[in-house]
Amino acid sequence: MDFLNYPEPLADLITGLSRLPGIGPKTAGRLAFYLLQQPQVAENLAETMIRAQREIRQCSLCCNYTDHDPCPICTGEKRERTLLCIVEQPRDVVSLEKTREFKGLYHVLHGVISPLEGVGPEQLTISKLLGRLEGVQEVVMAMNPTVEGEATALYLSRLLKPLGIKVTRIAHGLPVGGDLEYADEITIARALEGRRQI
């Protein structure tokens, strides 16, 4: 998008907004003009972003985002401390918590192993993970079913199995209400692998 006719601060705002995931130049332009027309909304948004940037940090135990360290999940008295779920991103913890099914602890990797993007195990929080395994009996791998997610799960399972820890993987398969006819072969194969007795 050509920003030459815009004043520099407006062009910079559009450029900044377009750097956000899922926001293209046209949407960024619409958002920028909206924010200019709604100064109170813009001011509140700016204050909220600055506050979040200032107050949110990684939990020293699980690496999830929190405003208390350690986070409420890690300090929760009703949590099953022998069960640890490894996820890619903090938003994955939110998704799993919404189900109210998982009662253990979490560990957030903040990414996956991706050699093409220059991300190796040392760029993830694996060293912190290895330092908190005392008393853990089972680790649940909850990475996304991507090539990188699978590679990360395999890498971690090779590290954890020699320690005598049971390593499991969440099942992947058909969504509720999904039709077999529209599912790809990998999804159907995973659904068959993850089948259980009824």
Swiss-Prot record:
Keywords in alphabetical order: DNA damage, DNA recombination, DNA repair, Metal-binding, Zinc, Zinc-finger
Pfam families: RecR_C, RecR_HhH, RecR_ZnF, Toprim_4
PROSITE patterns: TOPRIM
Alphabetized InterPro entries for the sequence: DNA_Rcmb_RecR, Rcmb_RecR, Rcmb_RecR_Znf, TOPRIM_dom, TOPRIM_RecR
GO molecular function: DNA binding; zinc ion binding
GO biological process: DNA recombination; DNA repair
Ranges for domain Toprim: 82-175
Record has Zinc as a keyword: yes
Zinc finger (C4-type): 59-74
Protein task: May play a role in DNA repair. It seems to be involved in an RecBC-independent recombinational process of DNA repair. It may act with RecF and RecO.
Similarity annotation: Belongs to the RecR family.
PANTHER family: RECOMBINATION PROTEIN RECR
Protein name: Recombination protein RecR
Organism expressing this protein natively: Desulfitobacterium hafniense (strain Y51)
Gene name tied to this protein: recR
